[in-house]
Amino acid sequence: AQIDLNITPAKYEKIFGELSSHQCEIIDDKQSKYIVVAAGPGSGKTRVLVHKLASLLLLEDVKHEQLLMLTFSRAAATEFKKRLIDLVGNVAHYVEIKTFHSYSFDLIGKQGSLEEAKEVVQHAAEMIEKREVEPSKIAKSVLVIDEAQDMGQDDFRLVQALMRQNEEMRVIAV
């Protein structure tokens, strides 16, 4: 299978070589519309997500603008970006990896303040539901959610709204 790939054997090894067979199954899965990875702390969920993003970009020909990753902290977003750069290089700079709040502020088209932060995710979800967001801003083929178990009602509503607008969107939740 490696012969057909548009990446070097060394890059292929970097993406798949350090992973367990279960982790490789997740990264190799090109069919499932929904993937949920449930595992304990320290089990490699973050690694799986980063390697899955690398696989999407390099092996499945998903374009960077088709990817959206949502997380709960800027620190997590920064760490993901750093790890992705290590695997795929400069293309990682163009992958949208944001917190739920920063993504929501982007969608509603304004800078965020602490007072507004409480309601911004709900407001963004409402705007998507009412089709008040430019479709190109939310057209994604893959949504990756870090720490999905921490989603509150508003976060989940935002994810549902995105899924309704992108019926073919694959969702990977950890």
What are these regions (language model features)?
Residues 63, 93-96, 120-124, 167-170:
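Glycine-rich loops and low-complexity Gly/Arg-rich segments
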Residues 99-102, 126-130, 174:
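Short C-terminal domain-edge/linker segments immediately following a structured domain
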Residues 41-46, 51, 74, 142, ...:
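Conserved helicase motor core of SF1/SF2 NTP-dependent helicases
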Residues 1-113, 153:
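P-loop NTPase Walker
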Residues 60-62, 135-137, 164-167:
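Conserved catalytic network of the ASCE P-loop NTPase/AAA+ motor domain
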Residues 108-140, 147, 151-161:
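Conserved RecA-like ASCE ATPase "motif II neighborhood" in helicase/translocase motors
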Residues 33, 94, 140-142, 171:
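The start of beta-strands in P-loop NTPase/AAA+ ATPase cores
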Residues 56, 87, 131, 162-165:
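Hydrophobic helix-cap positions at the C-terminus of alpha-helices
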